[in-house]
Amino acid sequence: MEKLSDITRFREHQNIILQGFDPVSAGGFTQVPNCLLNQANLSFAAKVVYAKLLSYAWHNNRVFPGQETMANELGTSQPTITRAIQELEDNGWLEIQRRGQGKTNVYVLKYVVGEGRRG
C-alpha cells in the first residue's frame, strides 16, 4: 500500500487533476516519449498518430492497424493519417513493413533521441 500513498501524495501536488480516473480500470493508458512531444518539427497529427500506434503496440511488439481504422478512432481522415505516418517515417520515428496489396502494414516504432532525421 506504500505505492498507493505515493500516488496520492503526488496527486496532491500536481497541477492536473485526474477526477474519477483509475489508470488500471479505465481501459489502460499510453506513455508517449517526451522527446517526441517536444520535437518542434513534427506536426500535431504525427504525434497523435504515434501515440495511437503505441496504444496498439502494448499487447505485442508488432503494430499493424489499418489507416482507415486509425482515422475513424481519431476522428480524422485517412489522408491525414497517411501524411502523419509518412512524416514519422521521414523523421526516423517508425519503419513501415509493407505486407502487400489489401493487407495492413506493420509499423516498427522507434525511439529517436534529439531532433530525429529531417525528411
What do these predicted ranges mean?
Residues 90-98:
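A short, conserved structural fragment
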Residues 66, 99-118:
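Short, cationic-aromatic polyanion-contact patches
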Residues 1-80, 87-89, 102:
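Short recognition helix of helix-turn-helix/winged-helix DNA-binding domains
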